[in-house]
Amino acid sequence: VREIASTTWTVDRRAFKIYDPRPINISTFYHYQTWKTGVETKFIPKTESIWELSNTFVEPKFNYAYNLDGKLFTKYNLTTAMVSLRWNPFSDYMQTPTGRIETEKRYPKFTFQFTKSLPNVGNNDFEFSKIDFRTEYQKNYLNGQKTSLLFEAGYTIGDLPLTHLYNTSPNNLNKETIIQRVTFAGKNSFETMFFNEFFSSKFAYFQFKHSFNRIHLLKKVKPNLVVVSRMGLGDMEKPEQHVGINYKTLRDGYFESGIELNQIYNGIGLSGFYRYGPNQLAKFQDNIAVKISFILNLGF
């Protein structure tokens, strides 16, 4: 199973993740069976890319049907060609017996991904194109502080079910009170956005983070203060095609800001976020999210 409307950066599939808490909060998935073949190459300097052909059977595990020209699809096949490319133009690399490794990380870094359906191949049901882009920037200061910027954008053309559009990474439980909604924070998620609240066929996302030096309160209590702001903008083309699920769009924008106190004790921290702007909710408490953070420090 996989989260609906989530973006998977194929070139990141071999990235090393110690702990990713967000999946434990997700409640809406789709079942899929896929076969794929591809090639990974680092032929172009300072890039890594994956070129892939795949055929996927998809069955949403929630109340949803895709309406294409009056025909309702509750399950479907997607045959696609995809290229996913990471480009780190300012980093330094070293060639080793086991391959090329990044020895000095420098920013910005860029990731591109293009997916195209293949009509009349492998029982493919829909014709579409999907373009995704991401850039990351990080500035480390001599005093130990750090500023991080992240920008992502996605755009779809053609006919594509909700399962493969964009949800902009919500991470707020659909429960009544602030205490009931306390859960683990994601890395780059909208912490005040409820699951399945917004969907988009095109979107842009920006995140700003600034990390201050750790505050020495007690011998083992040294929290790391981080200020965070996030914003998103998007829209849904052909909304009449998506049947059975209620949602909103990001046409008016989405904004949240917050403070993280990470690694208060043994990697455990606490954070709070506030939702504001055009999509602010009527009840004050519904705009607040309190989260638990966890960071495992391996010492390198």
Each language-model region and where it sits:
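Exposed, low-structure sequence patches enriched in small/polar residues
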Residues: 1-300
